[in-house]
Amino acid sequence: MNVETIETPSLGDRSYLVHDGEVALVVDPQRDLDRVLSAADDAMVAITHVAETHLHNDYVSGGLALSRRTGATYLHAAAEVLPFDHRGVGDGDVIEVGSLTVRVVATPGHTQHHLSYHLTENGDGKGAGAGALFTGGSLLYGSVGRTDLVAADLTDTLTRLQYRSVRGMIDSLPGDTRFYPTHGFGSFCSSSQGGDDSDGTLAGERSVNLALTIEDEDNFVERLVSGLSDHPAYYAQMSPMNRAGGIPVDLSPAAPVDPTELLRRIHRGEWVVDLRNRRAYATDHVVGTIGIELDDPFATYLGWLIPWGTAVTLVDDTAEELVEAQRQLARIGIDRPAGGADGGPDVWGKDHDRASYPAIT
C-alpha cells in the first residue's frame, strides 16, 4: 500500500492518494483537482474510488467533480441526505479497491455522521499489514477535530461522541496502525494545535492525545469546549456548498483591470486587495486598497473578513501571485475574482493617490 500526501498548507489540510500500484482511492480531495490528477499520473494509477470523511466546514470539496471526471465511485456517509450520485456507506461496510480492503468506521464527533476509513492489504489487518487509518476531522495528531461547527446546541453531544469515537478506534485497531488526518496542520477545524509529539501511530497517541490522557468524559468535554477559539466566518458557507455537491472550479486567469477601472472600483468602496508583503504595502500602496499578504493564511483571513458574496479585485507585482491567490480563494468557494492587475503600484497605481505607513525594523 502506498500513501501519497497532497498538502494544502494554506488551509492546514491534507488529502491522500492511496494505491496498490494499479488503482487508487482518494480521501478528502480539495477543489483544485490538477494536483490530485498529477499525483495519480505520477504513480501511474487509475482513481477508482473517492471517499469523504465528512461534509467539510473549512473548504469546498472536489470529491464530486473528481468522481465525475474519473468515473470513480464516490463514498459518503449513508446517513447524509445528499442530492448527487454517490455510494452511501456506514460502519462496518467493506469496499475493495484493487488489492486493498477498505473498512468503514463510524467516528461521529467532528460532525454527526463522520466516517474514518481503515485500509489494509489483502484484508489481513495483521502485523506489518495493520494498515492505514484515514481519520479526517476525528483523531488528529495530538488532538481531535473541533466539535462546535455543526450547531451550538449540538456541541456537548458531539464532544462526547468525539471522545468515544477516538477511544473506540484506539481500542479496536492494532497499535501500529498509522493514521492520516485531514485536519490539524494549522486548520481551524482542529480543537487545539498539537502533533509535535505524535509518531503517527494509534499506540503513540495514547500518551499525547487529550482524548486519551483524560480518563473522565465530563472533564474532557469541559477542557475541549473551554479551549475552542473563534473560527473563520466563511465556515458557515462551506457545509451547505458541500451538501449541494459543489461545482467544478474555474482557475482561468481573472479579467485584467486597467488603472482607470481600478480607481473607479476603489471610489465605489469595492474590495481591492493588495497581495504584496506587508513591508512593501507599508512602504507604498494605493489609497483605498486593502493589504492582505499572500502567504499561507491568506484565504482564511480574507474569507474571515469579507462579507460573503462581495466582489474582490486582486492586485500584485506578478501575474503568478494573482494565479496563486485565485487558487487559494477557490478552495473556500470564492470562485472568480472580479479582476486582477499586476506590475506593481507604479503600473496599476499610476496617477492614483499613494500612501505609506511608518515601519519599525
Feature names for model-found ranges:
Residues 24, 101, 111-229:
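Metallo-beta-lactamase
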Residues 29-30, 55, 79, 111, ...:
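Active-site metal-binding loops of divalent metal-dependent hydrolases
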Residues 33-75:
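Active-site metal-binding motif and surrounding structural segment of the metallo-beta-lactamase
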Residues 32, 63, 68, 72-74, ...:
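Hydrophobic, small-residue-rich alpha-helical packing segments that form membrane-like cores
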Residues 1-46, 117-120, 125-136, 142:
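Conserved beta-strand hairpin/beta-sheet module of binuclear metal-dependent hydrolase folds
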Residues 18, 28, 54, 66, ...:
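Divalent metal-coordination and catalytic microenvironments
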Residues 146-148, 203-237, 246, 252, ...:
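Rhodanese-like catalytic fold shared by cysteine-dependent sulfurtransferases
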Residues 26-28, 46-56, 75-79, 106-109, ...:
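Active-site neighborhood of phospho(di)ester-bond hydrolases with catalytic His/Asp-centered motifs
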